[in-house]
Amino acid sequence: MSSLTQLPQWQALQTHLEENRSVQMRDLFDQDSQRFSRFSLQQGELLFDYSKNRITAETMARLLDLARAQDVEGWRDRMFAGEAINETEGRAVLHVALRNRSGRPIRVAGEDVMPAINQVLQQMRQFSEAVRSGAWKGQSGQAITDVVNIGIGGSDLGPVMVCEALKPYHQPGLSVHFVSNVDGTHMAETLKGLNAETTLFIVASKTFTTQETLTNAHTARDWLVAQLGEAAVRKHFVALSTNAEAVSAFGIDTDNMFAFWNWVGGRYSLWSAIGLPIAIAVGFEGFMALHDGAYAMDEHFRTAPLASNMPVIKALIGIWNHNFLGAESFAVLPYDQYLHRLAAYLQQADMESNGKYVTRDGARVDYTTGPVLFGEPGTNGQHSFYQLIHQSTRLVPADFIAAAHTHNPVGDHHAKLLSNFFAQTEALMTGKTAAQVRQELEAAGLHGAALEALVPHKVFDGNRPTNSILVRQFTPYTLGQLIALYEHTIHVQGMVWGINPYDQWGVELGKQLAKKILPELTTPGEVHSHDGSTNGLINHYKAWLAE
């Protein structure tokens, strides 16, 4: 048995759950006219409403006791202090330093990292402004019209999500594209229609050895060189890396290499040089506004008492829903089309961080950790998987996200969008009783056996937990707040679960086996070095390829 489930604070929550299993949220609202104000928090122009959860004041008090028992404040402070809280890799966790706007020193092993951060930011400012203004010329003397970011994982998902979310702030005439998949289709389709003379490639790989990224980078290089010659590489490629030797060997001028550090995890790296495509797309001031929003949430997280600390409260609500109410998944549902890549970004941020079954001291857990995260923009999801959220046997907590102001005030579109945003959380909470269904069916002219046969199908149990996040408008600043809110939520949950959210050993085994299999695919003859299924699949592939 792990120590977490033996804690008196954990067992007190278990007892509290048993005593309150029959609690209905609609009754809690009826009993407390101030429930919304009691269970909501605002930070700047971001409102977080968690009142539509199966919680009472006692639930929150007991969850906060658990957070204190797991030293959530201490782990938070150690992270901000630059201590090596990523123990398995012996590294500090300092994405917060990248957006530190206070000017105060942040140290790793006694060294203030802020001068190096500011130096790279200045380099990014100069380069992004040169590209945006047209001062940066390609080999033929033309300005850049298309930027292609080549990366994968954290070198792709964050920049893609932010660039899509901030499309209203993009510079006209300058397009940003992203290639991540080693499937040649991704690169081939991206290059279609691009003009080599006006295309800039950003190769994002800390080690400059990532298989997928370097495969795509060499394909892009071949495409460019075939049209413009070898000398063009220096004008049309830049690198986000720390491996100057490999960058230079590729043909990239190391003056155009943007560094970052091993205390920046990939899934937290959009704030670093990895964010260069963001700075080019929305301008460096927009990139800094993104940092400003994140910094505001950082300071709130760092200084607010636990009971009014938005990331802490959000994390504890998740602990309650997953570890005590039994939810295994979690939906992120942005009612904003610009946020259509948010769920994909958060899948990596959350599932790669907290998808662990071993604690920091190497013991197997006997409780659930990170949930399966999924999502789609509203209202698309309503016509897809919301049926399961409303009426299935599974409990699926959800975050609903929306902005009061739209960037595209077309007719009454936004009012209709937001009416669905508000309606869905109400429906999930209140449900619909059999008596209400009968009344509706009778009003529609249905009676007797036909009515009774339909009633069970139209009943909604309700009592489904949701959070609502409402911002005034999605800007670089408020997007920065939102991202940092999720980052710190993930951190707190990892600390409560006693796991390390900052390593990702689970991605290594498949990569190791792929390296072994790759030469087998081109070696003549059948393969017999794996299990029966894998051998059969490889040999079938080779037979079809040989036809």
UniProtKB/Swiss-Prot annotation:
Species of origin: Magnetococcus marinus (strain ATCC BAA-1437 / JCM 17883 / MC-1)
HAMAP family, per the entry: G6P_isomerase
NCBIfam families membership: PRK00179.1
GO function terms (MF aspect): carbohydrate derivative binding; glucose-6-phosphate isomerase activity; monosaccharide binding
Catalytic residues (positions): 352, 383, 511
Annotated protein name in UniProt: Glucose-6-phosphate isomerase
Any one biological process term the GO annotation gives: glycolytic process
E.C. number(s) listed in UniProt: 5.3.1.9
Catalytic activity: alpha-D-glucose 6-phosphate = beta-D-fructose 6-phosphate
Annotated pathway: Carbohydrate biosynthesis; gluconeogenesis; Carbohydrate degradation; glycolysis; D-glyceraldehyde 3-phosphate and glycerone phosphate from D-glucose: step 2/4
Pfam families: PGI
UniProt-annotated location(s): Cytoplasm
UniProt signal peptide: none
Gene this protein is translated from: pgi
InterPro entries (alphabetical): G6P_Isomerase (IPR001672), G6P_Isomerase_C (IPR023096), Phosphoglucose_isomerase_CS (IPR018189), SIS_dom_sf (IPR046348), SIS_PGI_1 (IPR035476), SIS_PGI_2 (IPR035482)
CDD domains: SIS_PGI_1, SIS_PGI_2
Family: Belongs to the GPI family.
Keyword terms of this UniProt record: Cytoplasm, Gluconeogenesis, Glycolysis, Isomerase
